[in-house]
A protein has these predicted regions:
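Short, hydrophobic/aromatic-rich segments at coil-to-beta transitions
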Residues: 194-200, 226, 305-313, 336-340, ...
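Solvent-exposed N-terminal domain segments of exported/luminal and surface proteins
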Residues: 23-225
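Bacterial N-terminal signal peptides
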Residues: 7-16
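Non-transmembrane domains of secretory- and envelope-associated proteins
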Residues: 22-120, 235, 246-299, 304-308, ...
């Protein structure tokens, strides 16, 4: 049945690609953003309440990547199954896709041309050579909201014992380009400077790192490198720094580009779209902060559910990159990467990144939100036997920030 469903989905995508170029049809919008409106995926062996564990792993063989299934089989973690959650993104984003996607193209250097807002390429033909690159651009421009503010604790967690490192921080991502208008308000205030988004990070504890801050500008043109600044209490100065995406953060082993599944430059990888699968995924949890358990308390153990997923493989172009490839499993409805498999230079499965997105109806203050609501992250390193984990205390979406929030002098003022 799974092969039949995936065949239908792929066939519909290919058929639509061949027959619709001038406009994005209601059928395509329905397929891309409302795949569960008419019927939710189901399997008799995976009824809600079923537990997937080392004793029952065989019933999930067709619904998990082998690398994750092996961890369940080994007893590293277990989870229950829940009914699939319908989580459409914002109406403004969907409308922007419908209105503008037909004019989006790839330039000779792989940049977007004609992009305004919404999902750049709702039509993906697995047979097309550039389908992988298009999927990577969809990942870049998934509906992240205009502003996300997160109060969280970053932990470096070994297999046993207390965390090796624990950092409380305040983290903000705000977009200033290519966001759809909502209620007549234009959030695109950084178009003049070509800044797609700004990212701010402020350490609150421990004492020896308190008030250390960083600011990043990600430019809309992928060929342009990020600009980064840091502030440290010891210097009381803001310094411009170079941050390599292949570098690690806080001795965690995880690369800067690993967060959110992939947070790097599209240009740094060769991309291949591997197709559509129906898989179990940790999406739609009815909590405000993800629950972790299993080995090292590294794994997401809130209920998982059947989702239609797109599989995207990225191969680093740099010969000295720490990875040989990354494979992202993207939720079709939201284009959020739910789990990402990372392979070392010898081709061994080295890390798994879990990004968890919950049901906004169970997230106080975010009940109205129609973007993927982030509830936690775990980057498990099987070679170092630790995990880089983000434990969320509070998250807010689309709450406006002062115009000067990201000014460099504000970093100095906050550090006083």
């Amino acid at each position: 049945m799974q092969q039949r469903l995936c065949g239908i989905l792929c066939g519909l995508v290919c058929l639509t690609w061949q027959t619709v170029r001038a406009e994005i049809s209601a059928e395509v919008i329905q397929q891309r953003f409302y795949p569960y409106a008419a019927e939710k995926p189901a399997a008799a062996e995976l009824a809600p309440g079923t537990t997937i564990s080392k004793d029952t792993w065989e019933i999930a063989k067709a619904y998990l990547p082998p690398e994750i299934l092996d961890k369940v089989k080994a007893g590293e973690f277990a989870f229950a199954v829940q009914e699939t959650t319908d989580l459409p993104v914002s109406a403004a984003y969907i409308e922007a896709t419908k209105k503008h996607a037909d004019q989006v193209k790839l330039s000779a250097e792989g940049e977007l041309e004609g992009y305004v807002a919404g999902l750049p390429f709702p039509l993906l033909d697995p047979a097309e050579p550039q389908a992988g690159l298009k999927a990577a651009w969809n990942l870049r421009y998934r509906d992240f909201g205009d502003v996300m503010q997160v109060w969280n604790t970053f932990r470096l967690v070994p297999e046993t014992g207390s965390p090796d490192r624990e950092i409380e921080n305040y983290y903000v991502v705000a977009y200033g380009m290519h966001r759809p208008l909502t209620d007549g308000v234009n959030p695109n205030k950084w178009e003049k400077d070509g800044v797609l988004y700004k990212e701010f990070y402020h350490i609150l504890t421990p004492f020896d790192l308190k008030n250390t801050m960083s600011l990043k500008h990600r430019y809309v043109r992928d060929q342009a490198n990020d600009d980064n600044w840091t502030y440290t209490p010891a210097s009381r100065k803001v310094r411009k720094v170079i941050v390599r995406h292949e570098d690690t953060l806080y001795d965690s082993g995880a690369l800067n580009e690993d967060y959110f599944g992939f947070w790097g430059y599209v240009r740094s990888y060769s991309w291949k779209f591997l197709g559509v699968q129906r898989l179990l995924a940790p999406v739609g949890a009815r909590v405000a902060s993800a629950t972790f358990g299993g080995r090292g308390h590294w794994y997401p153990v809130d209920p998982w559910e059947l989702r239609v997923m797109l599989v995207l493989e990225g191969t680093p172009k740099a010969s000295d990159h720490p990875y040989s490839k990354r494979v992202l499993y993207l939720d079709q409805q939201t284009f959020a990467p739910v789990y990402t498999l990372l392979y070392d230079r010898q081709g061994r499965h080295q890390r798994t990144v879990f990004d968890l997105y919950g049901n906004p109806q169970f997230n106080p203050g975010n009940e109205h939100v129609r973007v993927p609501v982030w509830i936690g992250e775990s980057i498990i390193d099987y070679e170092s036997k630790n995990a880089s984990m983000t434990i969320i205390t509070k998250i807010l979406y689309n709450v406006p920030l002062p115009d000067d929030f990201f000014n460099l002098d504000k970093m100095v003022a906050r550090g006083q």
